[in-house]
Every structure is written in C-alpha cells, then in structure tokens.
Amino acid sequence: MTILLLISCKNSENTETEKKSESENEITQSEFKKVESQNGLNLEYQLLDENNEQIKFSSLTKMPEFPGGLDSLTKFIQRNYKFHQGFTEYINGKVKSTFVVDTFGKVVDIEIVERLRKDYDTACYKVISKIPDWKPAEIENNKKVKVKFLLPFKFVTDE
C-alpha cells in the first residue's frame, strides 16, 4: 500500500459530499486569495492586522517569503511529513489547515479546520509546526502584517 501526500493539488471543485462534510470552523474560500505559484502549490492567504481583522489585499506591497521560495516550502513539507506506515486500511481524503506567519516571520496559530482522521490531522499539524521562519509580509509604509494561510493536504491511497 502506498500513501500519496498531495500538497499541490489544484482541484477547486467540491463534491456534494465534501460540501456537506465541511466543519463549522471552515473558513469560506471568498475570504482567501490564491497564492500565485509556478509549482502548483494550492496555498491561499489573507492579510491580518494586529487585531486579527482582515486587511484589503490591495494594501499588500510584499508577500511573506519562505526561505528558498514556494518550491522549497513544498519540498520541506514532503521531507518532514511523517506518517505511520503500519496502517492497512485505504483512505482518501483531505486535511485543511491554517497557519499564520506573524510580523516576525514566525509560524503561529496552527489549526486543522477540516479533519480527515486523527492520525492524519496530527501528522499535518506536526509538519506545519516545524516550518522555519519566513520574511514577513508588508503593506504601505513598510509596515509588517500577519498573513493567514490556508493549506490543504490531499491523501490518495493506492494498492
């Protein structure tokens, strides 16, 4: 059995079952904007002020930067994702997570907003908690702001 972790899926269509299974903590897609990426990473973001209120996207002058860029972020997640290989059941599904890159570039406020199963949820949480510091985002006048990211993990199991 092989478990494939896809953090770069681009499927934005929700099936009727997926729509029904969205948790009450789910953040609506309209509140997030897609990160433009050449590697297909399905990462979305929103800007937050010091009170965690959303800021207009148009005020952004500099996106937060992961060391080495988004390709390096994808590789980091794939290298650091740890999953127990002893499971014999097949599972396909998605874990959606959010995290904030604060004004110091630290990854904070990690949440699993759409759950799959406890072991998968925990593994996703752990890999996000290991993400190193970023260069923080900036708006006008070089003011640093927080950025909240939405990162889905898609799992596909084959025999």
Positions of PLM-derived features:
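C-terminal motif of bacterial Sec signal peptides marking the signal peptidase cleavage site
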Residues: L5-S8
